[in-house]
A protein has these predicted regions:
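Generic hydrophobic, amphipathic alpha-helix propensity
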Residues: 11-22, 39, 64-68, 72, ...
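Amphipathic alpha-helical linker/stalk segments
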Residues: 66-90, 123, 132-135, 139-140
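N-terminal intrinsically disordered/low-complexity leader segments
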Residues: 1-13, 195-197
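Helix-turn-helix
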Residues: 17, 21, 25-59
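Hydrophobic alpha-helical connector segments
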Residues: 77-106, 143-144, 153-156
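Amphipathic C-terminal alpha-helical segment
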Residues: 103, 110, 157-175, 189-197
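Amphipathic alpha-helical segments enriched in hydrophobic/aromatic and basic residues
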Residues: 26, 35-36, 57, 61-68, ...
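Amphipathic alpha-helical packing segments from all-alpha helical-bundle domains
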Residues: 100, 118-143, 150-154, 180-191
Length: 197
């Protein structure tokens, strides 16, 4: 039994090493620099060993995408818990979303397809941020029809993700200006939620 446990631990450790190596390569070279051979070289294995754990590069991207959505969800939950009202929660959550995008730019890129194709396999974890935001929007608006909440979510997402994407690609606006644009957008949309409620 101990031998089976050890083998399972070693397999999980190798799997984690593959994902960590992939992420390190992406941090150094970008997503276009990632391939199975580089991962194998990084962890000192042969490429066929990598394929025992992940069928292809997309499978690795999918796992990293899941990781990103789990991390983002946790940051959004924390932001929501720190707020005194649904309106404040919404503001803190979108600010946390913004902060996450720049603190882990590479994962954000694969999660949302910025300067690359996002992961083709949908992961259930991608729904968690959406649910957190729509639940909070619904609270602010007094529980309107789901279609209205969905529309308001995508209004927020379109503006904030668009601003993030522009900054990742690089437009050279000063940080202070970006922050003011972000805060103006968030407060404007929150105001529209309260008016519509």
């Amino acid at each position: 039994m101990a031998s089976k446990d050890r083998i399972l631990r070693q397999k999980e450790e190798t799997r984690c090493n593959i994902l960590n190596a992939a992420y390190d390569i992406v941090k150094e070279e970008g997503w276009l620099g990632l391939n199975m051979r580089k991962i194998a070289d990084r962890i000192e294995y042969t490429a066929p060993i990598i394929y025992e754990y992940f069928s292809n590069k997309d499978a690795i991207l999918n796992e990293l995408t899941k990781k990103g959505f789990l991390e983002l969800t946790q940051k959004l939950k924390t932001a929501k818990e720190e707020a005194a009202s649904p309106e404040e929660a919404l503001e803190k959550m979108w600010l946390a979303f913004w902060d996450y995008a720049f603190s882990d730019k590479e994962l954000y890129q694969v999660m949302f397809g910025v300067e690359m194709t996002c992961c083709l396999m949908q992961c259930a974890e991608a729904e968690n941020p959406y649910r957190l935001f729509t639940d909070t929007i619904s609270e602010v608006m007094g529980n309107p029809a789901h279609e209205i909440v969905k529309q308001k979510y995508f209004t927020f997402f379109s503006i904030i993700h668009g601003l993030i994407s522009i900054n990742i690609i690089g437009n050279g606006l000063p940080v202070e200006m970006n922050t003011q644009i972000l805060r103006d957008a968030i407060s404007g949309i929150i105001h529209s939620l309260k008016v519509a409620a």
